[in-house]
Every structure is written in structure tokens, then in C-alpha cells.
Amino acid sequence: PDVDHVFLRF
């Protein structure tokens, strides 16, 4: 989910 890559969005 988005939560799994939430910090990769930075």
C-alpha cells in the first residue's frame, strides 16, 4: 500500500 512507500515519496 501507499503506507509501505510513504517515506520513499520524499
Swiss-Prot record:
Biological process annotations from GO: neuropeptide signaling pathway
Tissue expression from the record: Found in axons of the male accessory glands, the salivary glands, the heart, and the oviduct.
Q: Report which residue ranges the record marks as coiled coil.
A: none
User: Residue positions of the PTM Phenylalanine amide?
Assistant: F10
Instruction: Report keywords, A-Z.
Output: Amidation, Neuropeptide, Secreted
| Top-level division of the source organism's lineage | Eukaryota
Major place of residence: secreted
> Which cellular compartments is it found in?
Secreted
- A cellular-component GO term for this protein: extracellular region
Q: Which family does it belong to?
A: Belongs to the FARP (FMRFamide related peptide) family.
Described function: Muscle inhibiting agent. Involved in the neural control of the visceral muscles of the heart, accessory glands and oviduct. May be involved in the regulation of saliva secretion.
Q: What is this protein called?
A: SchistoFLRFamide
Query: From which organism does this entry originate?
Result: Locusta migratoria (Migratory locust)
